[in-house]
Amino acid sequence: MGQLLYTEQKVQTLEAAFLKQPQVNCPVVHRFGPGIYIREVSIPAGTLSIGHRQTTTHLNVMLAGRVIMISEDGVKIEIAAPQTFVAGPGRKIGYILDDMIWQNIYATDETDVEKLEAMFLDKSQTWQEHQKNQQLLLSFDHSEDVADYYAAIAEYGFDHDTVQVQVQNLDDQIDLPHGGYKMMVAPSKIDGKGVFATASLEAGEVIAPARIAGKRTPAGRYTNHSKNPNAKMILLDNGDVNLVAAMPIVGCKGGNLGEEITIDYRQALSLAIRRN
Protein backbone atom coordinates (compact mmCIF):
# COMPACT_ATOMS: atom_id res chain seq x y z
CA MET A 1 0.00 0.00 0.00
CA GLY A 2 1.28 3.50 -0.80
CA GLN A 3 0.23 7.14 -0.56
CA LEU A 4 0.00 9.42 -3.61
CA LEU A 5 -0.80 13.11 -3.84
CA TYR A 6 -4.29 13.33 -5.33
CA THR A 7 -6.31 16.39 -6.32
CA GLU A 8 -9.34 16.69 -8.57
CA GLN A 9 -7.48 19.25 -10.68
CA LYS A 10 -4.67 16.77 -11.31
CA VAL A 11 -7.15 14.03 -12.14
CA GLN A 12 -8.92 16.24 -14.66
CA THR A 13 -5.58 17.20 -16.23
CA LEU A 14 -4.79 13.49 -16.59
CA GLU A 15 -8.32 12.84 -17.84
CA ALA A 16 -7.98 15.52 -20.53
CA ALA A 17 -4.68 14.04 -21.72
CA PHE A 18 -6.04 10.49 -21.87
CA LEU A 19 -9.22 11.53 -23.68
CA LYS A 20 -7.01 12.64 -26.57
CA GLN A 21 -5.76 9.07 -26.95
CA PRO A 22 -7.55 6.16 -28.68
CA GLN A 23 -10.12 4.64 -26.32
CA VAL A 24 -10.29 0.90 -25.62
CA ASN A 25 -13.40 -1.26 -25.77
CA CYS A 26 -15.15 -0.98 -22.40
CA PRO A 27 -18.49 -2.76 -22.75
CA VAL A 28 -21.19 -1.76 -20.28
CA VAL A 29 -24.15 -4.03 -19.53
CA HIS A 30 -27.14 -2.60 -17.67
CA ARG A 31 -28.86 -5.18 -15.45
CA PHE A 32 -32.19 -4.67 -13.69
CA GLY A 33 -34.05 -6.57 -11.00
CA PRO A 34 -36.72 -5.71 -8.42
CA GLY A 35 -35.48 -2.50 -6.77
CA ILE A 36 -31.95 -2.87 -8.14
CA TYR A 37 -29.74 -1.56 -10.96
CA ILE A 38 -26.38 -3.17 -11.73
CA ARG A 39 -23.96 -1.28 -13.96
CA GLU A 40 -21.42 -3.85 -15.18
CA VAL A 41 -18.28 -2.72 -17.00
CA SER A 42 -15.54 -4.90 -18.50
CA ILE A 43 -12.09 -3.34 -18.94
CA PRO A 44 -9.12 -5.07 -20.62
CA ALA A 45 -5.70 -5.51 -19.03
CA GLY A 46 -3.22 -2.71 -19.66
CA THR A 47 -5.84 0.03 -19.38
CA LEU A 48 -5.65 3.09 -17.15
CA SER A 49 -9.23 3.74 -16.11
CA ILE A 50 -10.46 7.03 -14.66
CA GLY A 51 -13.96 6.65 -13.29
CA HIS A 52 -16.73 9.22 -13.03
CA ARG A 53 -17.39 10.46 -9.50
CA GLN A 54 -19.93 8.27 -7.72
CA THR A 55 -22.55 10.33 -5.89
CA THR A 56 -23.84 7.72 -3.43
CA THR A 57 -22.74 4.98 -1.07
CA HIS A 58 -23.38 1.67 -2.83
CA LEU A 59 -22.29 -1.94 -3.23
CA ASN A 60 -19.30 -2.78 -5.45
CA VAL A 61 -18.59 -6.28 -6.77
CA MET A 62 -15.40 -7.18 -8.61
CA LEU A 63 -16.20 -10.38 -10.51
CA ALA A 64 -12.91 -10.87 -12.34
CA GLY A 65 -9.48 -9.33 -12.75
CA ARG A 66 -6.76 -7.57 -10.83
CA VAL A 67 -6.24 -3.82 -10.54
CA ILE A 68 -4.02 -1.25 -8.83
CA MET A 69 -6.50 1.27 -7.45
CA ILE A 70 -5.88 4.84 -6.33
CA SER A 71 -8.70 6.10 -4.14
CA GLU A 72 -9.73 9.73 -3.73
CA ASP A 73 -7.77 10.04 -0.49
CA GLY A 74 -4.58 9.05 -2.32
CA VAL A 75 -4.30 5.46 -1.09
CA LYS A 76 -2.84 3.00 -3.62
CA ILE A 77 -3.70 -0.67 -3.26
CA GLU A 78 -3.75 -3.77 -5.44
CA ILE A 79 -6.98 -5.74 -5.33
CA ALA A 80 -7.95 -8.98 -7.06
CA ALA A 81 -11.29 -10.64 -7.71
CA PRO A 82 -13.47 -11.81 -6.18
CA GLN A 83 -14.23 -8.76 -4.03
CA THR A 84 -17.45 -7.37 -2.55
CA PHE A 85 -17.50 -4.13 -0.58
CA VAL A 86 -19.47 -0.96 0.08
CA ALA A 87 -17.88 2.30 -1.09
CA GLY A 88 -18.96 5.86 -0.43
CA PRO A 89 -19.19 8.77 -2.84
CA GLY A 90 -15.97 9.55 -4.70
CA ARG A 91 -13.82 8.91 -7.72
CA LYS A 92 -11.33 6.14 -8.45
CA ILE A 93 -8.38 5.67 -10.78
CA GLY A 94 -7.23 2.16 -11.60
CA TYR A 95 -4.57 0.47 -13.71
CA ILE A 96 -5.97 -2.84 -14.91
CA LEU A 97 -3.45 -5.67 -14.50
CA ASP A 98 -5.77 -8.53 -15.58
CA ASP A 99 -9.02 -8.29 -17.57
CA MET A 100 -11.57 -6.91 -15.13
CA ILE A 101 -15.34 -7.13 -14.69
CA TRP A 102 -16.72 -4.63 -12.15
CA GLN A 103 -20.28 -4.08 -10.96
CA ASN A 104 -21.68 -0.98 -9.28
CA ILE A 105 -24.96 -1.96 -7.62
CA TYR A 106 -27.58 0.64 -6.76
CA ALA A 107 -30.90 0.45 -4.92
CA THR A 108 -33.48 1.98 -7.26
CA ASP A 109 -36.59 1.19 -9.27
CA GLU A 110 -35.52 3.49 -12.11
CA THR A 111 -34.75 1.77 -15.43
CA ASP A 112 -33.94 4.76 -17.67
CA VAL A 113 -30.13 4.62 -17.95
CA GLU A 114 -29.85 8.28 -18.89
CA LYS A 115 -31.67 9.21 -15.67
CA LEU A 116 -29.64 6.67 -13.68
CA GLU A 117 -26.38 8.21 -14.87
CA ALA A 118 -27.62 11.65 -13.81
CA MET A 119 -28.56 10.24 -10.39
CA PHE A 120 -25.43 8.23 -9.60
CA LEU A 121 -22.58 9.67 -11.69
CA ASP A 122 -21.10 13.16 -11.51
CA LYS A 123 -19.26 13.66 -14.80
CA SER A 124 -16.41 16.18 -14.70
CA GLN A 125 -16.32 19.45 -16.61
CA THR A 126 -13.38 18.03 -18.57
CA TRP A 127 -15.49 15.06 -19.64
CA GLN A 128 -18.48 17.21 -20.57
CA GLU A 129 -16.34 19.51 -22.72
CA HIS A 130 -14.81 16.46 -24.41
CA GLN A 131 -18.28 15.13 -25.20
CA LYS A 132 -19.36 18.45 -26.71
CA ASN A 133 -16.25 18.51 -28.90
CA GLN A 134 -16.86 14.89 -29.94
CA GLN A 135 -20.41 15.73 -30.97
CA LEU A 136 -19.12 18.55 -33.17
CA LEU A 137 -16.50 16.28 -34.75
CA LEU A 138 -18.96 13.44 -35.26
CA SER A 139 -21.77 15.51 -36.76
CA PHE A 140 -22.39 13.17 -39.68
CA ASP A 141 -24.78 14.30 -42.38
CA HIS A 142 -27.98 12.37 -41.70
CA SER A 143 -29.98 14.16 -44.39
CA GLU A 144 -30.34 10.93 -46.40
CA ASP A 145 -31.67 9.11 -43.33
CA VAL A 146 -34.17 11.90 -42.66
CA ALA A 147 -35.31 12.03 -46.30
CA ASP A 148 -35.72 8.26 -46.36
CA TYR A 149 -37.70 8.42 -43.10
CA TYR A 150 -40.24 10.75 -44.72
CA ALA A 151 -40.39 8.50 -47.78
CA ALA A 152 -40.87 5.38 -45.65
CA ILE A 153 -43.77 6.72 -43.58
CA ALA A 154 -45.42 8.21 -46.68
CA GLU A 155 -45.40 4.77 -48.31
CA TYR A 156 -47.61 3.59 -45.44
CA GLY A 157 -49.91 6.62 -45.51
CA PHE A 158 -48.46 8.54 -42.55
CA ASP A 159 -47.02 12.03 -42.18
CA HIS A 160 -44.50 13.27 -39.60
CA ASP A 161 -47.10 14.91 -37.33
CA THR A 162 -49.12 11.69 -37.13
CA VAL A 163 -46.00 9.70 -36.30
CA GLN A 164 -45.02 12.17 -33.57
CA VAL A 165 -48.44 11.90 -31.95
CA GLN A 166 -47.93 8.15 -31.74
CA VAL A 167 -44.34 8.51 -30.47
CA GLN A 168 -45.49 10.82 -27.66
CA ASN A 169 -48.46 8.64 -26.71
CA LEU A 170 -47.77 7.37 -23.20
CA ASP A 171 -50.74 5.01 -23.07
CA ASP A 172 -49.00 2.16 -24.90
CA GLN A 173 -45.57 2.39 -23.25
CA ILE A 174 -43.93 0.01 -20.82
CA ASP A 175 -40.54 -0.24 -19.10
CA LEU A 176 -38.07 -2.87 -20.21
CA PRO A 177 -38.55 -6.08 -18.23
CA HIS A 178 -35.94 -7.10 -15.66
CA GLY A 179 -32.80 -8.43 -17.32
CA GLY A 180 -29.51 -7.31 -18.83
CA TYR A 181 -29.20 -4.91 -21.77
CA LYS A 182 -26.34 -3.64 -23.92
CA MET A 183 -28.13 -0.43 -24.84
CA MET A 184 -29.36 2.90 -23.54
CA VAL A 185 -31.43 5.82 -24.79
CA ALA A 186 -29.50 9.05 -25.41
CA PRO A 187 -29.65 12.19 -27.59
CA SER A 188 -29.38 11.34 -31.29
CA LYS A 189 -27.97 13.24 -34.25
CA ILE A 190 -30.63 11.64 -36.44
CA ASP A 191 -33.65 12.84 -34.48
CA GLY A 192 -34.44 13.59 -30.85
CA LYS A 193 -33.40 10.59 -28.83
CA GLY A 194 -32.13 7.27 -30.12
CA VAL A 195 -30.99 3.86 -28.90
CA PHE A 196 -27.23 3.32 -28.59
CA ALA A 197 -25.10 0.22 -28.04
CA THR A 198 -23.16 0.22 -24.76
CA ALA A 199 -21.49 -3.13 -25.48
CA SER A 200 -20.67 -4.90 -28.74
CA LEU A 201 -23.55 -6.77 -30.37
CA GLU A 202 -23.28 -9.70 -32.77
CA ALA A 203 -25.47 -10.18 -35.83
CA GLY A 204 -28.65 -11.95 -34.77
CA GLU A 205 -28.30 -10.97 -31.10
CA VAL A 206 -31.49 -9.83 -29.38
CA ILE A 207 -30.90 -6.27 -28.19
CA ALA A 208 -34.14 -5.83 -26.25
CA PRO A 209 -37.87 -6.45 -26.42
CA ALA A 210 -39.45 -3.65 -28.48
CA ARG A 211 -43.12 -4.46 -27.93
CA ILE A 212 -44.68 -6.59 -25.19
CA ALA A 213 -48.39 -7.42 -25.10
CA GLY A 214 -49.08 -4.50 -27.43
CA LYS A 215 -47.05 -1.96 -25.46
CA ARG A 216 -43.82 -0.28 -26.60
CA THR A 217 -40.64 -0.45 -24.55
CA PRO A 218 -37.97 2.28 -24.87
CA ALA A 219 -36.40 0.13 -27.61
CA GLY A 220 -39.67 0.28 -29.51
CA ARG A 221 -40.24 3.97 -28.91
CA TYR A 222 -36.81 5.49 -29.50
CA THR A 223 -35.08 3.40 -32.19
CA ASN A 224 -34.56 5.75 -35.14
CA HIS A 225 -34.88 5.10 -38.87
CA SER A 226 -31.87 4.82 -41.16
CA LYS A 227 -31.48 4.29 -44.88
CA ASN A 228 -28.74 1.80 -43.95
CA PRO A 229 -29.97 0.19 -40.71
CA ASN A 230 -27.88 -2.06 -38.48
CA ALA A 231 -30.85 -3.72 -36.75
CA LYS A 232 -34.35 -4.98 -37.45
CA MET A 233 -37.59 -5.85 -35.70
CA ILE A 234 -38.50 -9.52 -35.36
CA LEU A 235 -42.12 -10.60 -34.80
CA LEU A 236 -42.51 -13.46 -32.31
CA ASP A 237 -45.20 -16.14 -32.39
CA ASN A 238 -47.00 -14.53 -29.43
CA GLY A 239 -47.22 -11.15 -31.20
CA ASP A 240 -44.41 -9.51 -29.24
CA VAL A 241 -41.56 -7.85 -31.13
CA ASN A 242 -37.81 -7.95 -30.46
CA LEU A 243 -35.16 -5.49 -31.62
CA VAL A 244 -32.36 -7.62 -33.11
CA ALA A 245 -28.91 -6.72 -34.46
CA ALA A 246 -28.72 -7.24 -38.24
CA MET A 247 -24.91 -6.94 -38.24
CA PRO A 248 -22.12 -6.46 -35.69
CA ILE A 249 -22.64 -3.19 -33.77
CA VAL A 250 -19.81 -1.46 -31.89
CA GLY A 251 -20.31 -0.73 -28.18
CA CYS A 252 -18.68 1.69 -25.74
CA LYS A 253 -15.07 2.73 -26.16
CA GLY A 254 -13.73 4.33 -23.03
CA GLY A 255 -16.75 6.18 -21.71
CA ASN A 256 -18.05 7.03 -25.17
CA LEU A 257 -21.31 5.51 -26.34
CA GLY A 258 -21.22 2.97 -29.11
CA GLU A 259 -23.02 3.11 -32.44
CA GLU A 260 -26.61 4.25 -32.70
CA ILE A 261 -28.93 1.30 -33.29
CA THR A 262 -31.22 1.95 -36.26
CA ILE A 263 -33.92 0.16 -38.24
CA ASP A 264 -35.81 0.59 -41.51
CA TYR A 265 -39.28 1.81 -40.57
CA ARG A 266 -40.68 0.07 -43.67
CA GLN A 267 -39.71 -3.27 -42.17
CA ALA A 268 -41.11 -2.30 -38.75
CA LEU A 269 -44.39 -1.04 -40.23
CA SER A 270 -44.80 -4.22 -42.27
CA LEU A 271 -44.57 -6.20 -39.01
CA ALA A 272 -47.21 -3.97 -37.43
CA ILE A 273 -49.56 -4.76 -40.31
CA ARG A 274 -48.89 -8.49 -39.96
CA ARG A 275 -49.38 -8.31 -36.19
CA ASN A 276 -52.75 -6.60 -36.60
Predicted regions mapped to residue ranges:
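Conserved catalytic SET/PR domain of SAM-dependent protein methyltransferases, capturing the structural core
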Residues: K132-N276
